[in-house]
């Protein structure tokens, strides 16, 4: 099971992911990240995958989608 922990900063939002990211987990994480981004509108979104033990192609989709989402709001992804 995947988890995400958020650390907001001044104009930034860091999301620390851990566990296994598969199709089912990616959907839940996507909703959590988007809700935080929409609420906080950070200039910079950082996704930290150092705690992830497994990731399939849905994790790649998660990254690409969050990049498009933050870009549409005028921010950037690292």
Spans of model-derived segments:
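STAS-typified acidic loop motif
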Residues: 2-31, 50-51
């Amino acid at each position: 099971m995947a988890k995400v922990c958020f650390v907001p900063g001044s104009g930034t939002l860091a999301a620390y992911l851990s566990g296994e990211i598969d199709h089912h987990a990616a959907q839940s994480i996507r909703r959590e990240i988007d809700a935080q981004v929409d609420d906080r509108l950070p200039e910079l979104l950082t996704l930290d995958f150092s705690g992830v033990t497994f990731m399939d192609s849905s994790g790649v989709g998660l990254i690409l989608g969050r990049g498009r989402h933050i870009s549409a709001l005028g921010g950037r992804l690292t």
